[in-house]
């Protein structure tokens, strides 16, 4: 073989490798960086929790009712889902939003937890905490222990519902990590993907509840959760999730007047990093 022929073969081989590389990348077509009005926001790929985009994602924020994602995690891992919910005057009198629990109601922890995630009931959050841990402070410790375990380093909980307390805080990045963990639990995914639900009481009657999450009802391809939030201190909050194929994106927005617009834009941006064949 002449040296010229060898050089030609090497060049052809290099060109073929380049073509294959470009062809693999060509399936992905990343969109322009998305805008947001959020004070803090974070987008992650739930497979490895890698941050795809963010805005002040490590800023300490009031998490409002996105807190209930951790409340659900701790409750789901308690082993008490089929036990009767403990409903105390403290729970019933908790500041709204409310699931409408009354003293004497008979309902399992599982059903109340589902209602809590759909309606964002603060009364249910307190009842869940007291059922699982005996008291709100004891439950908050369980929440903080779990946050530490998950690597949510800038998060501290003092209650299960997210009503404003300046010792109760998180970040968009931390909450994305927490939500990613939660979405790997099949029962959690079922709870937060419901637009409406007939909550079943132990005496046989049901109560129809509907979601506070407009994103879930938006028609966005793959939308499957997760949780809204609002307090005067926190502003409008949203943890949004969507799954296409084996890819799940999670976006968190804190203090965002345009959360319903930002969520689909950011999630679509996340999916644009991947070949369409991965999203089927």
Regions found by a protein language model. Give the residues of each.
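Sec-dependent N-terminal signal peptides of Gram-positive bacterial secreted proteins and lipoproteins
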Residues: 2-28
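A generic short-segment signal for beta-strand/edge and adjacent turn/coil regions
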Residues: 8, 41, 51-56, 84, ...
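Generic recognition of cysteine residues
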Residues: 17-18, 42, 237
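Residues in and immediately flanking transmembrane alpha helices
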Residues: 21-22, 81, 203, 278
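Active-site-adjacent loops and short helices of periplasmic peptidoglycan-processing enzymes
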Residues: 26-173, 177-186, 244
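Domain-terminus/edge residues, biased toward the C-terminal soluble/receptor-binding domains
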Residues: 152-153, 164-280
